[in-house]
Amino acid sequence: DRALGRRGVLVAELTYREAVSRAIAQEMERDPSVYFIGEDVAAAGGVFKTTEGLLERFGPSRVRDTPISEQAIIGAVMGAAMNGLRPVAELMFSDFFAGCWDLIANQIAKTRYMTNGQVSCPLVIKSGNGGSVRFGAQHSQSVENWAMSVPGIKVVSPATIDDARGMLQHALADPDPVLMFEHALLYNVE
């Protein structure tokens, strides 16, 4: 179960899903201010299983299930980020950004500018993105273009396993908000 990586070094074969999961766990291990919230991310391990095992490893204070309210999830991580934590929020599907877009585009993205750099929102919002996974019309869009023109937001959409791990780690180190769109058809790719 090992193969040569791009740099000729033996590496464990991972799926895209496992790379995302490991990156989250590594950053939570490295930085105690990183925590994870979203619908079904704790006990169920997330709709795409990218948070499987995190609850057992880090406990309920750092891996939390939320009600089905994207506005509540995003409002909570905004407040936490403004107060020194490094939250990661998962919105199950990127279509659901519509329900909390005001908070993302008009509040989170502009906090650094509205406070003259005194306050920032260092957070990550990650989401399954794209169609063809048979979850229905309201679970199939690719909405990263919504965020591309919003000043103050960084947008990443990892295409490879290395991208998924590296971009998530860099996003968690970034002083500004990062939206991470993970194409749903990539989760099982090795």
Question: Can you say where each PLM-predicted feature lies in the sequence?
Answer:
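Thiamine diphosphate
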Residues: 5-181
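Aromatic-enriched
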Residues: 183-190
